[in-house]
A protein has these predicted regions:
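C-terminal motif of bacterial Sec signal peptides marking the signal peptidase cleavage site
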Residues: 10-13
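A residue-level marker of the well-folded mature domains of exported/periplasmic proteins
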Residues: 22-385
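Bacterial signal peptide processing site
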Residues: 15-18
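Sec-dependent N-terminal signal peptides
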Residues: 1-6
Length: 385
């Protein structure tokens, strides 16, 4: 377990690399490469793209994005090659899939600054070690596998925002919940296990643990399709699931399509997905379990502009809560669009929840070796594909 208020953990801190520059935006040329999605995914890629574009325009910096031709490491590396050839010297790489690119490309381009968003120590070790990897990054020195001098990576304490989403759902009166993850990768698992813990805590607070059930499954991919929609149809229509946390980029489409048929609800992920999900049904989105991609992008680009790259180079930060003020945190719920309800769960109740987590009154486990031990019922179906 972790103390959820422990916010920023850093690994393999190294300084220098690539130089801090002149502390001016004039020399910056920013690029972003998409992973397996596109900049319209209403999730990871879109948030990174829109934030980087807005920051670059405000700071007079050249910005371009590149979409790999295929969903392969080779295609992602080729897109990075293309960005560097076009003059990029700061490259944003959103998603764990870019671990292979960081291993392959950071030594090839020592004068380019690489920012891996949602790329953790385990991801880098897995790609760096290859065959024989033990899946325990503590067995390795992660810095042996990529150029720490020109790379900054950030992961997120998804278990916290997942917890808050599950807590809110039960407090808002939902008793039959679902979790539809993309793939069973660490970030998705942290979201899911946090969601289960949050639902359990709210049920315990309300004295209704015997009445709350979570159906739990992974889709095996980060997009919706007919097979996953059919599984969601079964949940909403046959099992009377009321709300599903769709946790995996574009996989929300299958949950939303199924929910629309019966007036069901959906919880979004990564960013505030309400504007996209609500196109399937008015007020379909209960809330979204967000992580601060925008805050991270703004933070690191500003640091580079201000000549403070050495404070970030070589770090792998685990970003979570830093304040009782939700907007300052890297994990949160969207206050403007969450469906608060008087007498059940209000914005004021959310502020208290944030305070309790940040202050350590509520602790949340980030352990993903097994489903959390809880008092509510959890039905784990593995993976659809």
């Amino acid at each position: 377990a972790i103390l959820a208020s422990l916010m920023v953990l850093s690994l393999a801190a190294c300084g220098g690399g690539g130089g801090d520059g002149k502390g001016s935006s004039g020399d910056m040329n920013v690029a972003m490469v998409t992973d397996s999605g596109d900049i319209t995914d209403q999730s990871f890629n879109q948030t990174t793209y829109e934030t980087a574009k807005k920051w670059s325009e405000a700071n007079g910096v050249t910005f371009n994005y590149y979409k790999p031709e295929k969903d392969t490491d080779e295609a992602r590396n080729a897109a990075i090659d293309q960005a560097v050839a076009a003059g990029a010297n700061v490259i944003l790489l959103p998603g764990y899939m870019f671990a292979a690119s960081l291993v392959a490309q950071t030594n090839t381009y020592p004068d380019v600054k690489f920012i891996g968003l949602d790329v953790g120590e385990g991801d880098l070790c897995e790609k760096g070690v290859g065959e024989g990897y033990t899946y325990n990054p503590a067995d390795y020195n992660v810095g042996d596998y990529y150029n720490t001098a020109n790379t900054y990576c950030a992961t997120y304490q998804e278990e916290i925002s997942g917890f808050m989403a599950g807590y809110a759902a039960v407090k808002l009166g939902y008793r039959h919940l679902g979790f539809l993850g993309g793939m069973s990768v660490p970030a998705v698992m942290r979201f899911g296990y946090g969601y289960v813990q949050g639902a359990d805590k709210a049920a315990a607070d309300l004295g209704c643990t015997g009445d709350v059930t979570v159906e739990y499954v992974y889709g095996g991919q980060f997009f919706g399709d007919a097979d996953i929609t059919a599984a969601m149809d079964t949940w909403y229509s046959s099992r009377d699931v009321e709300v599903v946390f769709a946790c995996g980029g574009g996989i929300y489409t299958s949950a939303a399509e199924a929910a629309a048929k019966v007036g069901g609800k959906v919880i979004g992920v990564d960013s505030d997905q309400s504007s996209k999900i609500d196109t399937y049904g008015e007020k379909m989105t209960v809330t979204s379990a967000m992580k601060g991609l925008d805050a991270t992008v703004n933070m690191i680009l500003t640091a580079i502009k201000d000549g403070k790259w050495s404070e970030y180079a070589g770090k792998i930060d685990s970003l979570g809560m830093v304040s009782d003020e939700p907007s300052e945190n890297f994990v949160q719920l969207p206050r403007a669009t969450t469906q608060w309800a008087d007498g059940l769960f209000t914005d004021a109740d959310y502020l208290q929840l944030v305070k309790d987590i940040h202050g350590g009154k509520i602790t949340i486990s980030n352990d993903i070796t097994a489903m959390p031990s809880v008092s509510i019922t959890v039905n784990d179906y593995g993976s659809i594909k």
